[in-house]
Amino acid sequence: MLGSLMKSGVEITNDAAQADALIVNTCSFIDSAQEESVDTILESVELRDANRRGQAVIVSGCLSQRFREELPKLLPEVDAFMGIDQVARVGDIVGKAIASRAEKNGNEKLKIKNSKTKISARLNELEKNRDLSAREKEESLRGTDKFGKTKTVVAASRESAANLSLAEGTAAFSRNAATIFDVTSRPVFIPDFETPRFRLTPKHFAYLKIAEGCNHPCSFCIIPRMRGSHRSRTQKDIVAEAKALIADGVKEINLISQDSTYYGLDLRPNHSRAISSPEKFSAAAKSLAADATTICSLLRELNSIKGDFWIRLLYTHPAHWTDELIQTIADCKKVARYVDIPLQHIHENMLERMRRETSQQYIVDLIQKIRAGIPGIALRTTFIVGFPGETESSFETLLDFVRETKFERLGVFTYSQEDGTLAGKMAGQIPDKVKQKRRELVMAAQHKIARQVSENFVGREIKVLVEGQANEKQLQQANVSSWEHGLIREAETSKLQIQNYLIARGEADAPDIDGRIYIRGRLPIGEFAKVKIIGHTDYDLIAEPVA
């Protein structure tokens, strides 16, 4: 979006008070993100009305996409709404929104003060009353009868969203012909090499989107409705962007999408969306021509690019792993020895209710194959606790699995009941206190594992990517000063210590989500270096340069 704005000649500023237009890029993945988006929109409107009435407010992103029909009626104060497909035309939309604001300023009747609580409640109500198709109703019952633990209840009585009162907002919206509304019903946009870019990451690493959208039917997730079906970029296009990034000094390319392991399968002739289970995916992969585009062919071509850099594969789906992918990662030395594979649960009933298209035994076997086939691999995963119907027994199965598998990196989310999802309508919702307690138990188990993983690094020499100078807050959060004093007592980090520490990451650490390596000494920032691990804290390592 920033790249498209700059290409259009729009000047970017961090000072909201000086801007002619404010763009609120929203998230609507979970309720808390949705509420934060609404808060930010209304705060922007209040600041505009108090300080600069000529300033246009534009709402973009997932909230606009998810509530494309209702949001303009609920927020007539906003000057423009744009969806995911309109990113490349944002410059034109900004110009129209500024003109719209000028027209609105002449209409005093449009002064409406909205309540953020009222709007958030209304959006939740819209999703609760959304009619489910017959197929969705049938699918919502999956994984219940087999285990006999819980029942899914889909409300039979629904009030049409069109009949719910929106009198004030609808009236204002109908009077306001100047509001810009540009949101397609189902997104199809995907950036390519020609799409303008304005990178927000440091120069030494970048995210490279290889696909957009998702074909998976997970019962807890709203993403397919907001982002559309899975659609892959061409391999040629991705490789061209990767080469440009490497030429610009990038040392780490992080491949991202909603499902990276599905990459390329949608490009084959007569592609069907119903390729989600391991069996169907494996059969489809085997039927591909030798020169077909897949995640394996992409990794191999990226690996062949000249230069010293890492390729990191993020957001893989367990149902879409193949023996070929394991062999490809093992063969490609530039692909980081790191796998991001969100599993979400391990108990059979939970996997089926989540519609994860995998089984407990399949996951156990897959992890064994990955670890055997890629020596030195670091496994990162995430789990959801407190999903509807999660009994004490099914939770204990998950907890035992975490203790036994000993993931190098692990995150835990408490289930968030989302309107508009099948899981949001399921019976057996878990109290928040129970969900939080279960999260704490899993993280306590992982804390012990993480310390052991860190301890196993001590004495080793590894390759790292130097991120920058460590500041006092980072050193205190990592408890580095206590390590300096033999873990005997807390001690304030001295200025000398601050000046002497750098932050780096190893192959086992993705940006932002994993641990750090604190290096005592001086090394070039944004470059690879070899260090020796001399200590550790709970989740982080302490190192010194290898001469």
Give residue ranges: language-model regions.
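Intrinsically disordered, low-complexity acidic Ser/Thr-rich regulatory segments
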Residues: 145-148, 161-182, 282-294, 303, ...
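A structural motif corresponding to the C-terminal lobe/cap of the Radical SAM core domain
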Residues: 334-337, 349-467, 523-527
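Intrinsically disordered, low-complexity Ser/Thr- and acidic-rich flexible linkers and loops
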Residues: 112, 116, 137-138, 145, ...
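Conserved, mostly hydrophobic/aromatic
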Residues: 218, 238, 255, 313, ...
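Terminal RNA-binding accessory module
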Residues: 425-547
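Proteins enriched for Cys/Gly/acidic motifs involved in redox and nucleic-acid/cofactor modification
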Residues: 1-263, 324, 339, 362-372, ...
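Generic beta-strand/beta-sheet core signal
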Residues: 60, 223-224, 256-258, 314-316, ...
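Conserved SAM/AdoMet-binding glycine-rich loop
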Residues: 57, 66, 247-395, 403
